[in-house]
Structures are given as structure tokens and as C-alpha cells.
């Protein structure tokens, strides 16, 4: 069973975010749809100047979170818990979680980046924020930051997509799994919505997907991941929208815009090894 108290995993009490709903324009038609943004207000952990208190830019830096494929704000909730002193806005991409899908635009990396840009503009954050993204969200975040690097303080990419899943340099196993997944989402998109959702959200499929995606021997972490996927992995607008987003996640990568990321970038890999890069 998943730990009842997330402090078992983070060492910090859970933070409860407040939901905001912002209207963003469709990148094609301009028609507005709602995007959910979850705000975590900072919790002081130490008095300024005392041991353990954050210093310099870290003390004030607002964070913006962007989740991964088939995710929502819950996917980065433990990270928010572990960073209590930071104000955080966790954005649910159009079509995922509580956010509406685009009325007309395809759900691509560029269009999702457009939506995040519109949300950031509406929030009017007071300082250059740090953008933190996971998995598919890393391609969206990299695309956005590459357009205007000076707008951002830093970029943090958690388990970034370094190359397209079907690229020849990937392992044969990776390419086969990616091809199977692509077919799975394409088939679901062609079904009526009810059977498509039954296929996409089938418990055995979600369970196997979790095992394939998870690299840990920690039973608490594995149980928590299974529980989160069971609860939130089917929070998407439609099978068609999900197929579009999967296509975007499997054909794009952070490498597409790496040369334009002229700001400090932190990469965190599956092995939990962090490498700080100052690019440019």
C-alpha cells in the first residue's frame, strides 16, 4: 500500500495548493479555454539569516512546474512538498488534469508552450521564475525557454526527453516499445470515446505501464507511484487529444532547441544524478 503520509518519502509535510483557472487562447483559432494552475504559497522553514535559511536568489525565486505525459499537478506534488520555502505555480497542460483541451489546435509541443506562455503572462510573476519540468513537460519547457531565455532565471529538466523515442540511436527495445505505444494510442483515438477510455485506463495496462516507467527498489516509492497512476493517469480530455500529445512526446526532444538554451540548466536523470550545465 502507498504510504498514508508523504513525509515518509520527502521528510516534509504535504502542502495543499489552491486552484486558479485562467483563460488562454487557442493557438489556431484564438478561442479561449480554461487552464488550471495550482498555487503553493511558501512556508517559512527558517528565519532569514539563520542556519538552514535559503540565501540570495534561492530565497525568493518563484517556481513554475510543468508535468509529464498523462500527468497533472499531482505528479510533482512531492517536489513541491520538499521545497516549502518557494512559491510554486503548477500548470496543468491543456487537455490534462482539470485543464480543458484546445478547441481547435492540435496538442503539440509548440502549442502547449504557447499555453504555458499565456499562463505565465497572466500570472505576472514578480521575478524571473525557475521553470521545472518533467518528461514530456521538458520538451514543452525547453521550447518555451528557447524563445526568450532572458525571461527565465533557470531551467530544471527532470528525466528529460533527450531524443525522439523512435530515433535510430535508441535501443531496439526502446524503439519497439515506442512503436507499440504509438499504435496503442492511435487505435484508441479511432474508437468511440467510451471504449477508448476503457482501453486507455484499463488497470492492467496502467499497472504494466507503471512498472515499465519506474526504476526503483524502494517499495514505498513504487507503491506510491502505482497509487498515483491509478488515481490520476486517466485525467485526460479525450482519446484523440491523448494521441496527439503522445505523438508530440515521441517525436520531439529537448535536443531540438538545446543550442538556444542560453541560461543555467539543471538536468536530473533517472539515476538521480544531477548535472549542472551553463549553456552558451
Where are these regions (language model features)?
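An N-terminal hydrophobic leader/cap segment in hydrolases
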Residues: 1-26
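Conserved HGGG/HGGXW glycine-rich cap/lid loop of the alpha/beta-hydrolase fold
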Residues: 36-100
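Conserved acidic catalytic loop of the alpha/beta-hydrolase fold
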Residues: 110-128
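Flexible "cap/lid" loop of the alpha/beta hydrolase fold
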Residues: 146, 152-194
Amino acid at each position: 500500500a502507498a504510504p498514508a503520509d508523504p513525509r515518509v518519502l520527502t521528510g516534509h509535510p504535504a502542502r495543499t495548493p489552491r486552484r486558479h483557472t485562467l483563460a488562454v487562447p487557442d493557438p489556431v483559432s484564438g478561442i479561449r479555454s480554461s487552464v488550471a494552475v495550482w498555487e503553493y504559497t511558501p512556508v517559512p522553514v527558517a528565519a532569514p539569516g539563520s542556519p538552514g535559511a535559503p540565501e540570495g536568489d534561492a530565497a525568493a525565486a518563484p517556481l513554475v512546474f510543468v508535468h509529464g505525459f498523462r500527468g497533472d499537478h499531482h505528479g510533482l506534488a512531492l517536489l513541491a512538498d520538499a521545497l516549502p520555502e518557494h512559491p510554486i505555480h503548477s500548470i496543468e497542460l491543456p487537455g490534462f488534469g482539470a485543464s480543458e483541451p484546445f478547441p481547435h489546435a492540435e496538442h503539440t509541443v509548440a502549442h502547449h508552450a504557447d499555453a504555458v506562455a499565456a499562463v505565465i503572462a497572466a500570472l505576472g510573476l514578480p521575478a524571473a521564475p525557475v521553470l521545472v519540468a518533467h518528461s514530456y513537460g521538458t520538451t514543452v519547457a525547453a521550447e518555451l525557454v528557447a524563445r526568450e531565455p532572458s525571461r527565465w532565471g533557470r531551467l530544471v529538466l527532470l528525466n528529460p526527453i533527450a531524443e525522439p523515442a523512435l530515433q535510430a540511436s535508441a535501443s531496439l527495445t526502446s524503439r519497439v516499445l515506442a512503436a507499440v505505444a504509438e499504435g496503442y494510442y492511435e487505435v484508441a483515438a479511432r474508437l468511440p470515446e467510451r471504449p477508448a477510455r476503457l482501453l486507455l485506463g484499463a488497470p492492467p495496462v496502467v499497472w504494466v505501464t507503471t512498472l515499465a516507467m519506474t526504476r526503483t527498489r524502494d517499495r514505498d516509492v513504487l507503491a506510491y507511484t502505482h497509487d498515483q497512476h491509478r488515481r490520476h493517469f486517466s485525467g485526460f480530455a479525450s482519446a484523440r487529444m491523448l494521441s496527439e500529445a503522445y505523438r508530440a512526446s515521441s517525436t520531439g526532444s529537448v535536443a531540438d532547441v538545446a543550442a538556444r538554451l542560453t541560461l543555467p540548466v539543471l538536468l536530473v536523470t533517472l539515476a538521480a544524478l544531477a548535472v549542472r550545465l551553463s549553456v552558451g
